Amino acid sequence: MRTFNYSQEIQNLLTPEIVQLLTCIHEHKGRQDLFLEANTDELKTLVDVAMIQSTGASNRIEGIFTSDKRLEALVRKKAEPHNRSEQEIAGYREVLALIHENHDYISPAPNVIRQLHRDLYSYSTGAIGGDYKNADNVIAETDAQGHQRARFIPVPAFQTADAMDSLCQSFQNAWQENIIDKLLLTPMFILDFLCIHPFNDGNGRMSRLLTLLLLYRAGYIVGKYISLEMLIEKTKTTYYEALQASSFGGHENQNTYAPFVTYYLGIIIKAYAEFEDRIQYLVTKKISKPDRIKAIISQTLGKISKKDLMERCPDISQGTIERTLSSLVKEGYIIKVGSGPATAYIRKQ
């Protein structure tokens, strides 16, 4: 069975590239605390939007969908779930809110992880949450011809409980020793969790919830304001490539954490960059909302959509964004391209 020796593995991760990523995130975290102290009112808007985006994105990655209108209503608890997909979305909302509010009191022990999984399925019919898998599972992929092949074979069902106990104990020991940077330890734990794949269903969503939990416990709370899940969704292909590269040879303890760790550090940096960008716009009270929209467009290379602007300006209504875009088109400042859902805008050169 796989062993987890984080102290030994860490030496292989201290490459110039990863060290540079760590330095960048540490610098962002230093500024994070200043932003949090100075902009309390503006941050609530970001939290509300990120909650909706995170819940939607993490479920969409797993093929669980609902409309944007229904998603917002479910996350804001203004609607009850109508089907299985919405039940799972509502469950994700509950666990995400729990982590937001109580992360300091939630330790990633096996029984706690099972309780979080139980809550993930708290709206679902049938007792499928909270229990480890009762059958072996295979991570498969389908090629262009429709043929399936095994991408990864996780830990067998009968070894799952022991593997989770070993994983969590090794992780807790490394966390408490405080020798390994927690920015490295977190994605290492998440990779090993995914390689065990302890549940029949919900492993991907649990991995993203656990990522937020561990980052929050380490003091990196950017995921509360910027949706890490949405950033992962937007780079899903790269995510799966990094996961596959790092999981190969895992059963023989011959795998490398580097691709997966590098990917996750890049996601965190992207989140911090977006966080600082949005805060700057939110606190710029002297600039009108239409001028803020125009400023964002002026700094964007290539196309930008209405949805992009709504994500970057969560305090500006959809109507204001639509009117501003229409006005800028009439002025000749931007050009409208595409139609329907594919509509986007490009700044006229």
Model-inferred region functions:
Residues 1-349:
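FIC/Doc superfamily catalytic core
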